[in-house]
From Swiss-Prot:
This is Sulfur carrier protein TusA. The gene is tusA. Keywords: Cytoplasm. GO terms for cellular component: cytoplasm. The keyword Transmembrane helix does not apply. Sulfur carrier protein which probably makes part of a sulfur-relay system. Coiled coil: none annotated. One of its GO terms (molecular function) is sulfur carrier activity. PROSITE patterns: UPF0033. It is found in: Cytoplasm.
Amino acid sequence: MTTTIFQQTNHTLDAIGLRCPEPVMMVRMNIRKIASGETLLIKCDDPSTARDIPSFCRFMEHELLAKQTDTLPFLYVIKKN
């Protein structure tokens, strides 16, 4: 089995079932709790996250390391700046 970036994160947030603006609010709360340089995997199914999570990362100067939005659940990996 191949290990992917989605399997190598420090923390995980399950936001499945939440709708805008809740997923990004949860990401913000969780990012605040982790150390700089650590990673957060977000699992969600809200289509608006395809726009909102990359925008959040740009605005807050965190690094979006990976995203998978072709199938559900959508997956994002953010590295805290």
